[in-house]
């Protein structure tokens, strides 16, 4: 398909004082962001609001998912042991109260980078008042790696299902499977019940509505509490084409179906991404309510 984008996919041009401050601070501290690396359409809204999704473990991924614009290689550069410290310094300088930390996949590392991720979480948690959401790799489903991240006590743990079961082999790298993602999410909720669990689905890749609802049910059955759904947008001619531009009305219907299935919050819209600011605002209130003394 990939015809002309509909009007509801127009985005704001990045700008503003807060946007520039976030951009320059992250650039100065040599931190990679999904906002820039993946050409996120919400960069103006998020950076302008003083938040960002920061990417750990470099900007080269060991997987080649057919929807993703991040660079790939079998053997990326070695990890920078100072990266967690640099990250905490950047967030402290920006004065944020909520940060989303994600990463590339690092299948070349024995633990998939779990210890590096956990180090970053612990350093960030030392910043007073900061809530930490992590969007991690699946660590090839390794329970020990998932446990390492859980023990670092993130406030929110996300791992993205990305698409429906039928399309997973065509959309995601062969190392990533539908059930592996569900297993990682289930383990986190089972072993660390205080951590809010979250996942995301892209639509417009040729899925059927019933398949999206089935994926929602699978996520709920594995303890996922927060769901985001957004339109797949093709990053380049080398990536999967858009099969359909899903209407705002259908996104609204997906939201209603998700809430009926028991998700505590569903962000569903054409420009929604997994690290979506509206979901962040809900999560902040949710976490604070869980931690208040009763």
Curated annotation (Swiss-Prot):
Instruction: Name the source's superkingdom.
Output: Bacteria
- Please state where this protein is localized: Cytoplasm
One short Pfam family name for this protein?
Radical_SAM
InterPro entries linked to this entry: Aldolase_TIM (IPR013785), Elp3/MiaA/NifB-like_rSAM (IPR006638), LIAS_N (IPR031691), Lipoyl_synth (IPR003698), rSAM (IPR007197)
Return the cofactor note field.
Binds 2 [4Fe-4S] clusters per subunit. One cluster is coordinated with 3 cysteines and an exchangeable S-adenosyl-L-methionine.
Query: Which residues belong to any copy of the Radical SAM core domain?
Result: 46-264
Q: Which GO terms describe its molecular function?
A: 4 iron, 4 sulfur cluster binding; lipoate synthase activity; metal ion binding
Please give the cofactor(s) recorded in the UniProt entry for this protein: [4Fe-4S] cluster
SMART domains the record matches = Elp3
Positions bound to [4Fe-4S] cluster 2: 61, 65, 68
Gene Ontology, cellular component aspect = cytoplasm
Predominant subcellular localization, coarse grouping: cytoplasm
Q: What EC number(s) would the UniProt record show?
A: 2.8.1.8
Q: Which residues does the record give as [4Fe-4S] cluster 1 binding sites? A: 35, 40, 46, 275
Keywords associated with the record? 4Fe-4S, Cytoplasm, Iron, Iron-sulfur, Metal-binding, S-adenosyl-L-methionine, Transferase
- Kindly report, in one word, the top-level EC class recorded for this enzyme: transferase
Query: Which reaction equation describes what this protein catalyses?
Result: [[Fe-S] cluster scaffold protein carrying a second [4Fe-4S](2+) cluster] + N(6)-octanoyl-L-lysyl-[protein] + 2 oxidized [2Fe-2S]-[ferredoxin] + 2 S-adenosyl-L-methionine + 4 H(+) = [[Fe-S] cluster scaffold protein] + N(6)-[(R)-dihydrolipoyl]-L-lysyl-[protein] + 4 Fe(3+) + 2 hydrogen sulfide + 2 5'-deoxyadenosine + 2 L-methionine + 2 reduced [2Fe-2S]-[ferredoxin]
Q: In which pathway does it act?
A: Protein modification; protein lipoylation via endogenous pathway; protein N(6)-(lipoyl)lysine from octanoyl-[acyl-carrier-protein]: step 2/2
Q: Which family does it belong to?
A: Belongs to the radical SAM superfamily. Lipoyl synthase family.
NCBIfam families the record matches: lipA, PRK05481.1, PRK12928.1
Q: What is this protein called?
A: Lipoyl synthase
Which species is this UniProt entry from?
Anaeromyxobacter dehalogenans (strain 2CP-C)
